Amino acid sequence: MEKTVEKMSASNSLEIASRTGIEIVKEGDVIAWTGRYGGNNKPRGPLSGKKIGVIIASDFSDFQAYHLVSYIGEFGGTCEFLLVDWVTSMFTRPNISGKGVRGMWDVSVDPISVMGGNKQGYKSLKKADSKDYDALIILGGHSADIMVTETEVIDFIKAASKRGALIGGIGGGMIPMISAGIMTGKRCTGDLTVEFMLKKIANFESSSVVVDGKIVTARSTVDTPAFVRAICRTFESGFEDPRKDCLAGKRALLIVTDNFEDIELVVPTMELIYRGAEVLIGKFPPELKSRPALLGVDVLTGNFGVSIPFQEIPDSYYSIKNLKDVKTADFDIAVITGAFNPWNMVATGTTEWLKGAYAAGKMIAAICHGPIALAAADMVKGKKLTGWLASKDSVEIMGGEFKPREWAAAIDGRIVSGRTPQEVPEFLDAITVALLEE
């Protein structure tokens, strides 16, 4: 008999969201994600008790790193970045031993600065012991090409594989796995940088994710959410995440300009795609264009180098419009990322557009500094929200109740709020619950 796969829906969304061990409470009409596990590794999940080493050299994929650091802990695992930080050639970003390494778009892992809590650790790979890890993941980007020449890296992968650890790679991350001799004869996938080799030595499949025993491979960055779930299944047979495609038919508008918080845009975009939602980027011009500081350039850049259009997500997965051209009929929920994106919304008068969307009955979600824009649009009176501490005065002066220390995420009517980058998973579950229950 064919197994019935559970799907997240209006009737079970809160129960599914709480399975990780996060506490979800109802306070009047408010639903809040709260307790000590908010923004931290969760106590329950298929990766519970597992230590996952993520091997990176400079020029790694920022997008993949952002998602893994957000979701390994969400499924109960411990993420530790293993830095190939001694290489002095073939990198295009500063690589300082003892400091960390930098991604292709410039995020540094020393550790990732905007991620608090216990979601990440890091050390030089030379100081790590392969016996300490239940799984190793090698990221894509140019990182794999840089590390493949390093004997210490190849020997580390070989030792972990021989001991029975799971080995995973995304995109070009299979380059060191090929060199370590663990891909021969294996069913696998990958991007064009490894496909031609894998077709000769392995059983290549043009699929998003392929699992062959303890080898897990993903084709590209956009497949990272499915890759993480595939790793979960190798540790817990039969695991299926009910979030897969649960938002099919829903439309999410992400409001963006320069100086947005990279992780708060990248991870929601990747997860919303995984959950089946249609993603629309609504862009507006900033008051000042500081990243890059060039007039007339039609590219928006986050605090840590991610751009719109996205460098690592093909445009077939999302669309972009000028926010002024977006109609309320185009979306079901508008999402505001943090950093200085909300500041620009206020400074440019974009909050007037927000007022119109809210008056039309649309749901609005905001994380980190995002509540500042909600307050400026006079949408928080009588509402209870969470967010970064910098939003406190704005929310309270405009009549809202601000609970950043208590809540990781919250739903109050048509307002969804999230605390900081480390609470992106809770924020996304709150968005999912709100959309399913509307």
Listing of model-derived features with the role each one plays in the protein:
Residues 169-173, 367-370:
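Short, thiol/selenol-centered motifs that function as redox-active sites or metal-ligating centers
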Residues 166:
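Active-site environment of divalent metal-dependent phosphoester hydrolases
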Residues 2-163, 175-187, 195-360, 364, ...:
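Extended, subdomain-level signal for the structured scaffold at the beginning of enzyme domains
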